[in-house]
C-alpha cells in the first residue's frame, strides 16, 4: 500500500530498472540494497526499513537466507531468475518468481501519482560509515530535479544509448533510471563489470553515455588489447566516487572516451558538482588539462 517499502537486491538487470517505476507507481518506496553487503547488514536494512516485499536475484540466495533468519517483520519474497545466465546452482528463495508475478497483474491498473511532491520515492542506505548504515529518504521533488538537472548539466540529447554501469543501488544509479525515460533513451543493462563485455555492448548498441567509478576506468585503460574494441564514435563518461589519477583522463581520451569528473553524496541524490570544461583551457599543456579535469567542480 501507499508508503510501504519494497526492497530489491539485484544486479543491473531489467528488473531493477523496472522497479524504479513500478514501485513508485503503486505509491510504495523503493529500497535498492547494496549487493556487496554481508547478511547482518542486509538483515538490519530489511528490519529498519520495515520492508514488506523483497525482490531478489537468486544469486544472492546464501546472503538472503542468512539475513532473513534475523528479520522479524514478515516479508513477501519475489525471486529474479535471470534467463541470460546459468542459474542451476542458485537456490529458490521465495514462493514467487518475478516474471510469473508480473503476469498476474491487472493490465487496466491506474498508477498512483503522489499527492504531494515531498512524498518519499526512495529509501537508500549509506555505506562505509561507522555503526549501522544510515537511511536516506529521497522525495519525488528531489528525484525529479536531479533527473532533469543531470540531463541539462551533461548536455544529454534525446534517444541516446546509455550503458548502466553504476549500480542502481548506488543513489538509485545517480537517478539516471528516471532521466533516461525522459530522454527516450535506449537502456543497455550490464549485470557485472566485465570490460570485454562492456566493449562488446558499446560496439553493438553504439553506446553514447555511461557513468563509472575511477576503478572501472582503470580496468578499461588497462584491459588486454584483445578485449578492447575501437570506438565508432565518442563515448561520454561521468566518473565519481574517488579521486581519479589525472593520467586516467589522458588514457581514456586516447581510447575515444570523453570523461567528466563529478562529486556527490547519497544525501544529494548523487553528483551535484562537476568539472564543466572551459574552452579557454584547450590551449593548455596536456598535463595541466588533465590536472583540471581531475577536479570535481
Predicted regions and their residues:
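Conserved structural elements of the adenylate-forming
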Residues: 103-108, 122, 136-157, 165-169, ...
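Conserved pre-ATP/AMP-binding loop-to-beta segment of ANL
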Residues: 78-79, 90, 94-96, 102-125, ...
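Conserved AMP-binding/adenylation subdomain of ANL enzymes
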Residues: 144-161, 169-209, 223-224
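Structural core segment of the AMP-binding/adenylate-forming
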Residues: 25-100
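Gly/Ser/Thr-rich phosphate-binding loop
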Residues: 182, 207-212, 221-294
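ATP-dependent adenylate-forming carboxylate-activation enzymes
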Residues: 10, 28-46, 58-64, 165, ...
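Short hydrophobic alpha-helices that are characteristic scaffold elements of the AMP-binding
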Residues: 21-26, 48, 170, 181-182
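Conserved AMP-binding/adenylate-forming
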Residues: 1-39
Amino acid at each position: 500500500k501507499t508508503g510501504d517499502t519494497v526492497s530489491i537486491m539485484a544486479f543491473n538487470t531489467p528488473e531493477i530498472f523496472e522497479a524504479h517505476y513500478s514501485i513508485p507507481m503503486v505509491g510504495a518506496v523503493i529500497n535498492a540494497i547494496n549487493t556487496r553487503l554481508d547478511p547482518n547488514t542486509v538483515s538490519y536494512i530489511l528490519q529498519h526499513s520495515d520492508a514488506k516485499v523483497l525482490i531478489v536475484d537468486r544469486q544472492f540466495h546464501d546472503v538472503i537466507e542468512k539475513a532473513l533468519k534475523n528479520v522479524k517483520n514478515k516479508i513477501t519474497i519475489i525471486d529474479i531468475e535471470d534467463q541470460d545466465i546459468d542459474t542451476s546452482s542458485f537456490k529458490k528463495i521465495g514462493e514467487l518468481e518475478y516474471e510469473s508475478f508480473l503476469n498476474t497483474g491487472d493490465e487496466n491498473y491506474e498508477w498512483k501519482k503522489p499527492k504531494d511532491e515531498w512524498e518519499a520515492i526512495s529509501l537508500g542506505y549509506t555505506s562505509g560509515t561507522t555503526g549501522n548504515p544510515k537511511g536516506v529518504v529521497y522525495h519525488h521533488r528531489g528525484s525529479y530535479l536531479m533527473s532533469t538537472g543531470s540531463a541539462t548539466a551533461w548536455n544529454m540529447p534525446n534517444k541516446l544509448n546509455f550503458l548502466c554501469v553504476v549500480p542502481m543501488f548506488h543513489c538509485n544509479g545517480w537517478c539516471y533510471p528516471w532521466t533516461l525515460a525522459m530522454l527516450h533513451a535506449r537502456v543497455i543493462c550490464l549485470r557485472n563489470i566485465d570490460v570485454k563485455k562492456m566493449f562488446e555492448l558499446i560496439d553493438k548498441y553504439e553506446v553514447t553515455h555511461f557513468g563509472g567509478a575511477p576503478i572501472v576506468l582503470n580496468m578499461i585503460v588497462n584491459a588486454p588489447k584483445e578485449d578492447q574494441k575501437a570506438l565508432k564514435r565518442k563515448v561520454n563518461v561521468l566518473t565519481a566516487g574517488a579521486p581519479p589519477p589525472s593520467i586516467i583522463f589522458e588514457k581514456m581520451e586516447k581510447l575515444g572516451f570523453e570523461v567528466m569528473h563529478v562529486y556527490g553524496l547519497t544525501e544529494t541524490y548523487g553528483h551535484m558538482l562537476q568539472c564543466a570544461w572551459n574552452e579557454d583551457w584547450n590551449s593548455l599543456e596536456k598535463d595541466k588539462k588533465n590536472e583540471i579535469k581531475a577536479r570535481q567542480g
